[in-house]
Amino acid sequence: MSYTFDWLSKDVVKKLQGRDLRPVKCLSDATKFCLFNILQETSSRLALKTEYIPVGFTLLHLLEPNIPVPEPEVSAPIPLKHTISQKLKADLDVETIAGGEAGFVKSCGYDIEVQSKSIPNPKLESLQNRKLLDQLPTFMKTCWKDGKNLYVVTEAYEVTKDTVLEGTSNSKFAIKGIINQLVKVGGSGQWQTEKTDSIPIQKGSVLAYKKQQLVIEDNTCVILTSANTKKKMTFPMRFVGMSGHLRYQDLVIETGSWINDIDPIGTIKEPTHLDFMCLQNEVSEQTRLLAELSKDVQEVVFSSFLHMLCDRDVLYDLMKMLELNQLGHMDGPGGKILDELRKDSSLSWINLKDLILYLLQALMVLSDTQLCLLALSVEMRLLPHQVELVKSILQPNFKYPWNIPFTLQPQLLAPLQGEGLAITYELLEECGLKMELNNPRSTWDLEAKMPLSALYGSLSFLQQLSEA
């Protein structure tokens, strides 16, 4: 378990148990999920939830001026407190090795107070069917063209006073008889890290939110106020891209060639039935396209991601820039990836931006601990073995919604001895599986399905890049 803002917001959502309540992923965006803020959905992927990122505008920025703005309803403060400690430690018996130990010890707690600010459906009526401004922000052009839906925040749980999230973690590996790849010490290897996190969270930061979809037709904006309402696209019609400022009347198509390219207004395609083969085929196709990129491009992408893996904020910022189609300036390794995208040197049938987004979206599902363990796994060349192990868990259990005991295959565990085994078990435990280093048995948990799928995709991508 990694103790970060992301972990805090997810834990708060579990405690509040609100229907359709979603956690805010990143502290840097905690003030961008307030009431009326507009969110754009990310590209959809199999077995991964669609995420929602703020576009930097509120609904009030899009509507005609001087409209009545409904007053939010504010709940009484809700105190939330949580303390947790976690330990994963065991002596290891490793073939041809005299012995050793590995373990993780972590502790964390928080004591916060939140309150809900919401606009209930009856109050939203004053905003329904309002005229849009004549000139709309250019981000709407991209969303219309790409078929991305937009949403508005209608409820937000805010922190009522400044607070600090604190946590400590201790990771230790000690293996006799081998030379650790991280710290070389004579005939034995030892790696130990101790980390204390202190994350200040300002008053007004949003930890969780609810959203409702926008539908834009005939120069007006509608907020879908019922979960039972038949889903529509935000932009029921596609358009030919225009440059400069976007005017609503410019979105009317001047040719009739688009008519056969869209579904009837108000319809939505049924999703493909998900099974592991669908996920495997999707990951295989993406890694195949990745392999067709030039070695130079793959090396730049791999090196850049390796330097960013332990920094969720940088990964998230890069994902936002790509989702919002903003290839602006970015320092560090993320900037190198943007440079490659600007070159547009990839083969015409390969969309480098989509490939990078695929990996970013998978990584953002994982915890901070997993991100750092992935970097360590790359250094220790564990990826091929980890891919097969995760696949062996997903393949037989993917379709089951209930808890099923399973046993990890000995032949897949054999290459993952010592540190490799402890690192891999921690990756699995962070997905929600209960793991013990001396026990290959565990139990399938439906809540582990999504993080395991994201881990499978991340490992597969990084493995392909590492082999370039």
UniProtKB/Swiss-Prot annotation:
Q: Which UniProt keywords apply?
A: Cell membrane, Cytoplasm, Lipoprotein, Membrane, Necrosis, Palmitate, Transmembrane, Transmembrane beta strand
Q: Where is the signal peptide?
A: none
What are the recorded Gene Ontology BP terms? programmed cell death
Instruction: Name the family the entry cites.
Output: Belongs to the gasdermin family.
Q: Which organism is it from?
A: Mus musculus (Mouse)
Gene Ontology terms: cellular component: cytoplasm; cytosol; plasma membrane
Q: Which gene encodes it?
A: Gsdmc
- InterPro entries attached here? Gasdermin, Gasdermin_pore, Gasdermin_PUB
Domain remarks? Intramolecular interactions between N- and C-terminal domains are important for autoinhibition in the absence of activation signal. The intrinsic pyroptosis-inducing activity is carried by the N-terminal domain.
UniProt protein name: Gasdermin-C
In its record, the post-translational modification comment is: Cleavage by CASP8 relieves autoinhibition by releasing the N-terminal moiety (Gasdermin-C, N-terminal) that initiates pyroptosis. Palmitoylated.
Cite the residue spans of the region called Triggers pyroptosis: 1-230
